[in-house]
Design a protein with these regions (language model features):
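Beta-propeller and closely related beta-sheet repeat lectin domains
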Residues: 24-31, 42, 79-86, 139-146, ...
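N-terminal BTB/POZ boundary and linker segment
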Residues: 352, 359-405, 451-463, 551, ...
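A short helix->beta-strand "capping" segment at the edge of beta-propeller domains
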Residues: 2-23, 69, 130, 255
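Canonical BTB/POZ domain core
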Residues: 392-493
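Glycine-centered tight turns/hairpins at beta-strand boundaries that repeat
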Residues: 34-52, 90-109, 149-164, 184, ...
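Conserved blade-ending motifs and adjacent loop-strand segments that build the rim/top face
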Residues: 183-193, 252-270, 301-327, 372-379
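Beta-propeller blade signature
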Residues: 52-64, 107-125, 166-178, 236-249, ...
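Fungal intrinsically disordered, low-complexity serine/threonine- and proline-rich regulatory regions
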Residues: 1-7, 221-222, 278, 373-382, ...
Length: 658
């Protein structure tokens, strides 16, 4: 790995020291994120080998630990345990199973549990539901898989006290507090080598084909489950299955559908989290020559794997457990940077003194902006903007043009304008406002104000998107900042990388800036490789073909989970020579590219914006892709000038001994 790439990877990860009542090193404790808090429950102390039922809480913003001390009159904590599961359901933490002391409380006598305990996150108290006996009640187990979806808790696999795998799946209704379903499993699943996840909340609108977890004749499944497992770590086998525990016991196998430039190695005690349309797989990778904590991402739309390259940070020290901080699009890896990973793994020890924070957005992994209103409401907003009779103010642009608008509508979403308007109330009548932007940028800004979305082709020109992000930063418009950042991610290519880099640097969008910088470095690396290839060619031909810009050998795909066209230069339809002036200008230019575009430059390049849940893009073959107004028209786009840019395993039934 080159030093340049190494330094870029290191920009995405930072190590911080936690403080407060830091949990001691634990074995088999559960870690669950709720909001901006991480809850660590139970586990076995490494120092004394005693199990605990302590609850530690970490504020993910301040990185300060506190230990929960219950009120004297509140219910006691559950029995000490380890290798249990804890899932989030609304305002409750749901704890199931695990290994604990037998009733005699002898450290030499252990047992597996089958109980369900609830922790109320609002009252900060424990609750023990009265569960009626059921034929679907699960067998006691530990080191199992558990996933919560809607109001169902699904428990599958795990081991008994003889270290035998339990080939059973059970479903618990968290509303009625009863076991409602059970069945047999044909495979062995456990926390040592598998993860389960429920993709019911994944946004499928961006997927060009039906999600792999849905039946062809069943468009919607209330409780789809997916299980990824890896085993035989010397020659790793990777399995991916999907099934519906409530409707069918049949597992659909998707193992052969997974692909990627490289695939995950065998990860021990893996964990899985969902963010956007990706499943994040993390775990410990150990070989005689390599030991580190790995983070991988599976694109659920096309089942392509990519590695999240965190540089050299996670290659040193002992990093043991990762959790997703979804609200901030970041991944937290806990450990101790001064300890040895192999030694801690042999004791199954998890440390909480240090945390490595990985910026996932820099790899194109993030939650897409959600719609705030229906498409018909967005269209109605555009219609209002295009109706001069509803205007009571005139917006004057810096290129001498005007746009009639309604001040009440603008004031609802633009607080700065509302304050300016309140100062002029003593002067009723038609008003005018000078806006220091060009007409195309001003119109795109007003289209956002009226629709709360970026939905027109006008708004998705790269130059206009850059100015919209700057305006969002200047006027503190969080919604516009979110939408513009997302749109810039989608149109990030070699051609737009320098402009996106500069705009993100000006507006403090660090993740977008790092991603754009990676594209530029990859472009420069590609150009250098092309030059070397030309020099090493002993018999050059007059008309020589050079490697295609979208050649996989040119760009390592582990840097992004977006389509290769976004970062690998896939948008070139022809092969380019090393003397390509466009690439040379890109890799060497330091000039400003975020100035307000002139109309002539704006309309010569019309990208095809990527449709996402946050934008319903009008894609028409006719030139003006937004409604015309009666007072002032956007210059027409000549058809011959419009060019598109790509946006965006079996073994004996013997378990693992702990």
């Amino acid at each position: 790995m080159s030093s340049g790439t190494q330094s870029i990877a290191d920009l995405t990860t930072e190590i911080k020291l936690t403080s407060g009542s830091i949990p001691p090193p634990l074995v088999g404790a559960s870690t669950t994120v709720a909001g901006n808090s991480l809850y660590v429950f139970g586990g076995r102390l490494v120092s004394s080998r005693q199990m605990t039922n302590h609850l530690y809480i970490l504020n993910l913003d301040t990185l300060v630990w506190t230990q929960h001390i219950a009120q004297p009159d509140s219910p006691p904590a559950p029995r000490p345990r380890y290798f249990h599961s804890t899932n989030l359901f609304g305002r409750y933490l749901v704890v199931f199973g695990g290994m604990s002391y037998s009733v005699r409380r002898s450290s030499q006598s252990l047992c597996a549990l089958d109980d369900v305990c609830l922790f109320d996150l609002e009252l900060m108290t424990w609750k023990y539901p009265d569960i009626e006996p059921s034929i679907y009640a699960p067998q006691s187990r530990y080191a199992h898989l558990a996933v919560c979806s809607a109001d169902k808790l699904v428990v599958m696999g795990g081991q008994d006290m003889s270290n035998q795998y339990i080939n059973e799946i059970n479903v618990f209704n968290l509303t009625t507090l009863s076991w409602i379903h059970g069945g047999a499993l044909s495979r062995q699943y456990g926390a040592y080598r598998a993860v389960a996840f429920c993709p019911s909340n994944v946004d499928t609108s961006i997927m060009s084909t039906q999600p792999f977890w849905q039946e062809n004749n069943q468009p919607h499944n209330d409780l789809p489950l997916c299980v990824y497992s890896n085993y035989n770590f010397t020659d790793v086998t990777r399995d991916l299955q999907s099934f519906s525990p409530l409707t069918s016991a049949e597992f659909k196998d998707h193992s052969m559908d997974m692909s990627g430039t490289s695939l995950p190695p065998g990860l021990r005690f893996p964990s899985g989290d969902l963010l956007g349309h990706h499943m994040l797989l993390t775990g410990t990778y150990l070989t005689p020559t390599h030991r580190s904590f790995h983070i991988w991402a599976l694109n659920l739309a096309n089942l392509v794997w990519v590695r999240i390259d965190t540089g050299s940070i996670l290659s040193h020290g002992s990093w043991n457990r990762g959790v997703l901080y979804e609200d901030k699009q970041k991944f937290f890896v806990f450990g101790d940077k001064s300890r040895d990973l192999l030694e801690d793994y042999n004791h199954r020890q998890v440390n909480f003194a240090h945390v490595a924070i990985v910026e996932l957005e820099a790899f194109g992994i993030y939650s897409y902006p959600k719609e705030t209103c229906a498409p018909v409401a967005q269209e109605l907003g555009l219609s209002m903007l295009n109706e001069p009779s509803m205007a009571d103010i005139e917006i004057l642009t810096d290129d001498g043009r005007s746009i009639p608008a309604n001040s009440s509508v603008i004031a609802l979403r633009w607080t700065h304008f509302a304050s300016l308007l309140s100062e002029k109330l003593e002067n009723p009548g038609f008003k005018s406002l000078s806006f220091p932007e060009s007409y195309p940028v001003t119109l795109a800004f007003l289209q956002f104000i009226y629709t709360d979305h970026l939905m027109t082709a006008q708004q998705h020109y790269p130059q206009i998107l850059s100015r919209l992000l700057v305006l969002a930063d200047v006027y503190n418009l969080p919604r516009l900042r979110l939408l513009a950042t997302h749109a810039l991610h989608q149109i990030l290519t070699i051609q737009t990388a320098s402009m996106v880099y500069e705009t993100s640097a000006l507006t403090g969008r660090t993740a977008l800036q790092i991603r754009a910088l990676r594209v530029m470095i990859n472009a420069k690396k590609m150009l250098h490789q092309q030059q070397q290839q030309q020099q090493q060619n002993i018999h050059p031909q007059k008309h020589q073909d050079y490697p295609s810009m979208d050649s996989p050998s040119m760009f390592p795909t582990q840097y992004s989970t977006q389509r290769q066209s976004e970062e690998d230069g896939d948008f070139f339809q022809s092969r380019m020579s090393p003397s390509s002036s466009a690439v040379r200008r890109l890799t060497g230019s330091k000039s400003s590219t975020t100035a307000s575009p002139e109309p002539s430059s704006v309309y010569n390049m019309v990208p095809s914006p990527k449709v996402s849940k946050s934008s319903n893009v009008y894609q028409s073959q006719r030139s003006p892709q937004f409604a015309q107004r009666k007072t002032s028209l956007v210059p027409s786009i000549s058809q011959n000038k419009v060019g598109s840019m790509s946006p965006t395993f079996e073994r004996p039934n013997m378990g693992i001994r702990f």
